[in-house]
Amino acid sequence: MVRESGGLCIADEVQTGFGRVGAHYWGFETCDVIPDIVTMGKSMGNGHPLSALVTTKEIAEKFNNGMEYFNSFGGNPVSCAIGKAVLDVIDKEELQKNAKLVGDYLIKKLKGLQSNYEFIGQVRGQGLFIGIETDSYTHLTLPTKA
């Protein structure tokens, strides 16, 4: 729909990327979408300032108009080495698989708590990307006014 209107599909993988959703390496894969642009960062450098933008050659060439851009996340050999090391650890330590296993366990246990705690609403998520809806006001005991 967005492409039919001349727009681009942009996936922000800053929080959902690098295996956090468990079943897939990228969050957009859960929606069966191939975005035109993907942004990523944070977990990419495991605390080291590193980010990236991935797109097609055609889209990238439209930005090749002489304007330069600089930021603190700009590429350098140290950051690139750290990013590669992070990818190696994700692979070697099977962190994507772990995100799925631990996430499935957490979601199951959190859903089990719903019957004991009325303030817990929906529990949803994939892998270690989990959301818990809470209704803290309905069952909250407020202090008595003086």
Give each language-model segment a name.
Residues T141-A146:
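A short, hydrophobic C-terminal helix/tail in secreted or cell-surface proteins
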Residues M1-L140:
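Conserved N-terminal phosphate-binding loop of PLP-dependent enzymes in the Aspartate aminotransferase
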